[in-house]
Amino acid sequence: MTEQTRPLDVVILAAGQGTRMNSALPKVLHPVAGRPMVAWAVKAARDLGARKIVVVTGHGAEQVEAAVQQPGVAFARQERQLGTGDAFLSGASALTEGGADILVLYGDTPLLRPDTLRELVASHREQGSAMTVLTGELPDATGYGRIVRGEGGAVERIVEQKDASDAEKAIGEFNSGVYVFDERAPELARRIGNDNKAGEYYLTDLLGLYRAGGATVRAFRLSDPDEVLGANDRAGLTQLEATLQRRINEGHLKAGVSISLPGTVLIEDTVEIGRDVVIEPGALLRGQTRIAGGAVIGAYSVITDSVIHERAVIKAHSVLEQAEVGAGSDVGPFARLRPGSVLGEGVHIGNFVETKNARLDAGVKAGHLAYLGDVEIGAETNVGAGTIVANFDGLNKHQSKVGAGVFIGSNTTLIAPRVVGDAAFIAGGSAIHDDVPEGAMAVARGKQRNIEGWARRYWAAPERREKLAKKLPWLAGWLSRTQG
């Protein structure tokens, strides 16, 4: 086995509580750009082709394990928070095969690029190191452990912030907490002591143990120290979110997506977008959303777990969840497609139209103020303004079916379950409580009756008339003028 073909195991330390988050959610489960922070570390490990990935959990262990449970990921519990050395030993106990380099990552540093980690591992192997420390340089490295070098620039030790002298605190080179070890690390880690101010077992002490045995310890310096930024509080979380979102948006721009005002647009990492898509300011694209080429996403639209086909237009302020929009269709503005909504090609959904568990075939038009729930609507049907599919009886939802080429007049209510045949007409204002045959005209409304003088008698009642002058002066005058 050569240096370059030796397997790589990854241990991800994710046991901390994160008290400064002031949250019931474990720190590493706070989402950044669509993934929990710890899931970014798991993704990076997978991208490296790791043989085995072990996530060390502690606080909120069951929640963390449920969030990143997947094939190839194992878990180890750190029962007591005794420091990074103890956490590493917990994780190493699950590495039973041996013969691998071991990469240590943290569950709260989602900005680390897989390419950086790939270069780190390659450097470790090419230089024949027993331990390689990923370091960075900052004008003020407060909060980080410092890298103390000796003659010739060799890495001599890592000093934690709380144990550092004033001279050591002035050092700008910091320890990122990311390491590559050879296969001896678990055995050496058992010799780590806790003779420090915190009484903890520091993983950094492995450096001294390796050096004491004559092994080579080297550093690999980051070109961009922001890659190892973590989040200890909500402010740090927003900084991570902004950095990752900028990366994601820049990636889409390079891939041929037009994004107006990228700083206002949120696109989660799991979203896929085709070429020549236009995304207007304020859009939020989430989950497993897929957007095909040539589509337009209007300003302030929110799209989650949905499929948008070629040339579809989602107009401003529309909300889509678990929906599918066919090629060339347009939705909105101010429309809502709820789960189970499937629009065929060339469908028009206008302002203030809501759909749920609804299938609309090619060319259907619902232009204004409609609710279409639990319904199938055939091709080229026109749904008038104010149409409601009354699908709920107080206990159960009921399914309706409307054929192709149907004309539904404004302010119609379909009282489910109903079937409307192809090419039927429904007169405006109808409440349809029976099925409508193919080609028929359905009219279901009461005959208009005008009751002369009713308004005058209504407003002239003593309990109303005395309030008219103050609240409705024009009406009070009309009442006076029309009384005989």
Swiss-Prot record:
Keywords: Acyltransferase, Cell shape, Cell wall biogenesis/degradation, Cytoplasm, Magnesium, Metal-binding, Multifunctional enzyme, Nucleotidyltransferase, Peptidoglycan synthesis, Repeat, Transferase. GO terms for molecular function: glucosamine-1-phosphate N-acetyltransferase activity; magnesium ion binding; UDP-N-acetylglucosamine diphosphorylase activity. SUPFAM superfamilies: Nucleotide-diphospho-sugar transferases (SSF53448), Trimeric LpxA-like enzymes (SSF51161). It catalyses: alpha-D-glucosamine 1-phosphate + acetyl-CoA = N-acetyl-alpha-D-glucosamine 1-phosphate + CoA + H(+); N-acetyl-alpha-D-glucosamine 1-phosphate + UTP + H(+) = UDP-N-acetyl-alpha-D-glucosamine + diphosphate. Its cofactor is Mg(2+). Mg(2+) binds at D108, N232. It is found in: Cytoplasm. Its EC number is 2.7.7.23, 2.3.1.157. InterPro entries: Bifunctional_GlmU, GlmU-like, GlmU_C_LbH, MobA-like_NTP_Trfase, Nucleotide-diphossugar_trans, Trimer_LpxA-like_sf. GO terms for cellular component: cytoplasm; membrane. Pathway: Nucleotide-sugar biosynthesis; UDP-N-acetyl-alpha-D-glucosamine biosynthesis; N-acetyl-alpha-D-glucosamine 1-phosphate from alpha-D-glucosamine 6-phosphate (route II): step 2/2; Nucleotide-sugar biosynthesis; UDP-N-acetyl-alpha-D-glucosamine biosynthesis; UDP-N-acetyl-alpha-D-glucosamine from N-acetyl-alpha-D-glucosamine 1-phosphate: step 1/1; Bacterial outer membrane biogenesis; LPS lipid A biosynthesis. GO terms for biological process: cell morphogenesis; cell wall organization; lipid A biosynthetic process; peptidoglycan biosynthetic process; regulation of cell shape; UDP-N-acetylglucosamine biosynthetic process. Transmembrane segments: none annotated. Pfam families: NTP_transf_3. Residues 256-484 are annotated as: N-acetyltransferase. Binds 1 Mg(2+) ion per subunit. The active site is at H368 (proton acceptor). UDP-N-acetyl-alpha-D-glucosamine binds at residues 13-16, 27, 78, 83-84, 106-108, 145, 160, 175, 232, 338, 356, 371, 382. Acetyl-CoA binds at A385, S410, G428, R445. In the N-terminal section; belongs to the N-acetylglucosamine-1-phosphate uridyltransferase family. Catalyzes the last two sequential reactions in the de novo biosynthetic pathway for UDP-N-acetylglucosamine (UDP-GlcNAc). The C-terminal domain catalyzes the transfer of acetyl group from acetyl coenzyme A to glucosamine-1-phosphate (GlcN-1-P) to produce N-acetylglucosamine-1-phosphate (GlcNAc-1-P), which is converted into UDP-GlcNAc by the transfer of uridine 5-monophosphate (from uridine 5-triphosphate), a reaction catalyzed by the N-terminal domain. Homotrimer. This is Bifunctional protein GlmU. It comes from Deinococcus radiodurans (strain ATCC 13939 / DSM 20539 / JCM 16871 / CCUG 27074 / LMG 4051 / NBRC 15346 / NCIMB 9279 / VKM B-1422 / R1). The lineage of its organism: Bacteria, Thermotogati, Deinococcota, Deinococci, Deinococcales.
